[in-house]
C-alpha cells in the first residue's frame, strides 16, 4: 500500500466513524503515529492528507464504504467479528426454563415511549429466552391524576406488537377491583391493615415523627365498619384511606404505614365509569396482581426500588414468595422529550402536532421517523441491565438503524433548495440508468433523463463547489466545467462522460434532477422542526412508510404522497 492509499484508508475509516466527515488532524495523527518511518516526510504528507480528506469528505457515506471495501476490506471483517463477540443478556437469577413469568405494567395515560421500552423489552426478551410467559398488565387505577384514555390501551398493544412482542396474556387493573377489595378486607381482618380517617396533614405529621395514627390499633370490627363505609360512599374523597401496617421507625417515612386504597369521587373512568369509588394505589394493586398472575421476575427502574420494600409487607403477611426483582437505571436520549406530562402539555399548547410528532421519543414518533423495531430492541439489549442511569445519543440509535435499513432502502436523488444549471456542449439526450440499490441489481434501475436546452437542478448546499473554472461530476451522468454563477443559476460546459476522469482529477460529485416532484423533508432538530423543500426524482416509486435513502442527504421515511408532492421525515445520515 503506497502513501496515498495509506492516507486514503485512514481518511475513509475516520470519515465512516464520524458521520461521513474526516478530520485532517486525526488522519495525520494516525498516518504518522502508526507509520513512524513517514515522520521525516511530514511536511510533504500534510498537504497530501488535506487534499485526500477533502476528496473523501466530498463522497457520500455509501461511496466511502464502497471505496474502503475496495482498498481495505479487513476493516469491515473486523467490525463484524467485534459485533459477533458482543454478549447478549446475562443469565437471569433463579430462572428455570419454562417457568419464567414476566410482566410489563404501563399506565395508559399517554403513548408508550423509549424510556418505558427498557422494562418492556427486557421483560419480553427474558420471557422468550427462558421459554416462559410475558404478561401485559395495564395499570389504570388512577383516574384522577394519571387519567387513562381509551386510545392508549390500543396504542400500547399496537406498539408492542410492532416491536415484535408476543403478548401471552393481557390484564387490566380496573377490571380487577373486586379482587383488590377481597385482599384488602383479608388484611384488615388479619390486623395488618386499617382504615385511617386522619386529615392528610395530621397523618403526615404523625408519620414523620414515627407516631402511630390513633386509628391504627382500633378493633378489627371498627376497621371493617369503616371499610364498608368507604365502599358504600359514606366517606368523601380524602376522608378515609386504607393503610398497610409497617415499621413506624423505618428510615424512609414514605414506607411507614403506606396508603393502599383511597376514595376518588366521580372518577368517570373510561372503562368502569362511576361504578367504583375506592381505588387501589399502584403498590397495592401491583403487589396483588404479581402474586395472582404468577409473576416470577420483575424488571423495575432503580428510582422505583422502594416499591419492593413496601410490597414485601403484603407478601410477608400472606406468606407469599416475592418475585425476583431486577433493577435498572433510567434510559433517556439526548435532546428528546420522554416525559408524558411535558409531551401532553406541548400537544395541548400546539407545540407538537401529536404523540407521533417526530421530535418526540414515543415509539410512534420513532416509527414515523423511520426507526426500525429491531434497532430499538438491539439498543435496549446493548444497554442491558445497568443499574446506573443511561443517556444515549441519537447517533447511537442511528448507527444501529443505519446498519438495518441500509440493505433495504432504495436510493433516490433529492435536491434541496434547487438551483438551475444550464449545460452547453452536449447536444444529445442522455438517460442515466442508476441502480435502485448498488448491492442489489435485481431490484432494477431508475432512469433520469438529460435533455439539451433544459436545465438540471442542483442543490444550494453544493454552491461552494460551483466556482468558475472548477469541475464537478453530476453523479451517474457526466463531468462539467463551471463557467458562470449568478442569481439566475449556473452556467456549465460538458467536459467528459467517464467517471474515471473525475476520479483521477479528484473532482467532487453532486446529485441532480431534471423535472422533479415537489418534496419537503421534515428534519427534527431538538425542539425545532426544520422543513427542507426541494425536488425529488420525478419517477421515484415511493409510497407511505417506505424508508429510502436520499443520496448525499440521508435516510428518510416517506410520510405522505400525493400527485403534487411528497413529504418525508428525516431519520439520520
Swiss-Prot record:
One GO cellular component term noted in the UniProt record for this chain: cytosol
Top-level taxon in the UniProt lineage: Archaea
Keyword Lipid metabolism appears in the UniProt entry: no
Catalytic activity reported: tRNA(Glu) + L-glutamate + ATP = L-glutamyl-tRNA(Glu) + AMP + diphosphate
Record's subcellular location: Cytoplasm
GO biological process: amide biosynthetic process; glutamyl-tRNA aminoacylation
CDD domains according to UniProt: GluRS_non_core (cd09287)
Molecular function GO terms recorded: ATP binding; glutamate-tRNA ligase activity
Motif ('HIGH' region): 106-116
Residues in coiled coil: none
Chief place where the protein resides: cytoplasm
UniProt keyword terms in alphabetical order: Aminoacyl-tRNA synthetase, ATP-binding, Cytoplasm, Ligase, Nucleotide-binding, Protein biosynthesis
Catalytic activity, EC: 6.1.1.17
Keyword Electron transport in record: no
Similarity-based family: Belongs to the class-I aminoacyl-tRNA synthetase family. Glutamate--tRNA ligase type 2 subfamily.
Job description of the protein: Catalyzes the attachment of glutamate to tRNA(Glu) in a two-step reaction: glutamate is first activated by ATP to form Glu-AMP and then transferred to the acceptor end of tRNA(Glu).
Name used for this protein in its record: Glutamate--tRNA ligase
Lineage: Archaea, Methanobacteriati, Methanobacteriota, Thermococci, Thermococcales
Gene: gltX
